[in-house]
From Swiss-Prot:
May have a function in stress-related responses of the cell. This is Protein rds1. It comes from Schizosaccharomyces pombe (strain 972 / ATCC 24843). InterPro entries: Rds1. The gene is rds1. GO terms for cellular component: endoplasmic reticulum. Induction: When cells are starved for glucose, ammonium, or phosphate, when they are exposed to a carbon dioxide atmosphere, when they are shifted to higher temperatures or when they enter stationary phase. Adenine-repressible. Disulfide bonds: none annotated. Pfam families: Ferritin_2.
Length: 402
């Protein structure tokens, strides 16, 4: 049985059976469970304030009557976060165009990606032009410039898979910091950009023959998770680009891949000739999932101190101790499963079988998930997910399930 503890929005609810020994009690929320909490606002539906700031506009909200919004960073946090988003827009533009030129029409056709689907990918690249201009304009004249990149895919299927993975962690990275931006106007524009990217990721899943969105909620991750994932694919950047502040964690590797391993790309099943066992479709209800709850997951991880990123100018680091748990970050939850050390920087854990809410049908681990190794199982929720950073030993690893 998988032993796990999920720190979730279900106050006080231990969503998996067989709780690990190290206590990490979930946060309690009044009205859902746990101790009562005194809120400053009484949520009854009746007006707490009789005076409205404008017609048909209840009191409250942030900058709702701002007549001249400022779409610009208000802090170092804003600048560094928006710059990270821009780095992702640049690589996505490069990736979509590179993939379309690397493979011939015949190779795409053989993999089930016909001319209509290729045009969709081409339009995704065009969307990135708008996203790049948007974020660059908000950052101003000192915004980072485009870099040079490297990719390790060699088939159409692995190109689509990497594009789906990249757009997912880019999307999740923005969800992680968006609520914390000081510039609410900049956050509003970035939201309109990242929701477009969410549609890209869904379409790429459909091109893989995957179920388009097998989750109830999308996942948010810290900036350092997104930066750790993108940095290895950046070869070099212009000298005028200032270094980003975000941490690069040691890499985490999947030794035993998900269920489908006897095909050319273990991330999703293919026939030996590269065509999809499940062809591109609006929706595909798979008989066999990519991975299963309770299955063993073998991992290996790098030691800190490795040079990564643009011009190898960033060094991986961690402030954590010995890894004790695998933290599975998916949807609203962080679920901790025990890690059994099997060797030097290697170990085994299990895919948790917990559910999003008690008695719900939604498995927590579904779709594209993020896995990190930690030294302590601390309770975190989507709004304070960054608190996990100081406990990360290695990761994140992008883990496909469902």
């Amino acid at each position: 049985m998988v032993q796990a503890l999920t720190a979730s929005l279900m106050a006080g609810a231990l969503l998996a059976r067989g709780i690990i020994g190290a206590k990490a009690d979930p946060v309690n929320f009044a009205g859902i469970g746990g101790a009562a909490y005194e809120y400053n606002y009484t949520a009854t539906g009746s007006f707490n304030q009789s005076i409205m700031p404008a017609n048909f506009t209840p009191a409250g909200g942030i900058d709702t009557n701002d007549s001249s919004p400022t779409y610009h960073p208000f802090s170092d946090f804003d600048y560094q976060s928006l710059s990270l988003a821009l780095y992702h827009e640049y690589i996505e533009y490069d990736l979509f165009n590179y993939g379309l030129t690397k493979f011939s029409d015949a190779e795409f056709d053989e993999a089930g990606i016909d001319a209509e689907y290729r045009h969709l990918i081409r339009f995704m690249a065009q969307q990135e032009i708008g996203h790049i201009e948007l974020v660059t304009n908000m950052l101003g004249p000192n915004a980072p410039k485009a870099c040079s990149y490297q990719y390790n895919f060699d088939t159409v299927g692995s190109f689509i898979d990497f594009a789906q993975t990249l757009t997912k962690w880019s999307e999740s990275g923005v969800y992680g910091f968006l609520p914390h931006l000081d510039s609410r106007a900049a956050a509003a524009l970035l939201l309109q950009s990242i929701t477009t990217e969410a549609r890209q990721q869904m379409s790429l899943r459909q091109l893989q023959g995957l179920f388009p969105y097998p989750v109830w909620f999308e996942t948010g991750i810290p900036q350092s998770f997104a930066w750790s994932l993108i940095a290895p694919f950046i070869v070099g950047c212009p000298a005028e680009n200032e270094k980003l502040v975000w941490q690069n964690f040691p890499a985490l590797h999947l030794v035993s891949p998900p269920v489908h391993t006897n095909f050319t790309n273990g991330s999703f099943p293919q026939y030996p000739n590269g065509t999809y066992m499940y062809p591109a479709a609006v929706s595909t209800n798979r008989t066999f999932p990519l991975s299963l709850p309770g299955q063993s997951v073998e991992l290996a991880w790098d030691a800190p101190g490795m040079a990564v990123g643009p011009n190898s100018s960033y060094i991986t680091s961690t402030s954590a101790g010995t890894p004790r748990y695998a933290a599975w970050i998916s949807q609203l939850n962080v679920t901790y499963a025990p890690l059994n050390i099997t060797g030097n920087n290697s170990g085994v854990t299990y895919q948790p079988s917990s559910h999003l809410y008690n008695d719900s049908t939604q498995q927590v681990i579904n779709g594209t998930n993020f896995l990190v190794l930690v030294d302590e199982a601390i309770p975190v929720t989507p709004f304070n997910i960054t608190a996990i950073n100081e406990h990360v030993v290695a990761g994140p690893l992008v883990y496909e399930s469902g």
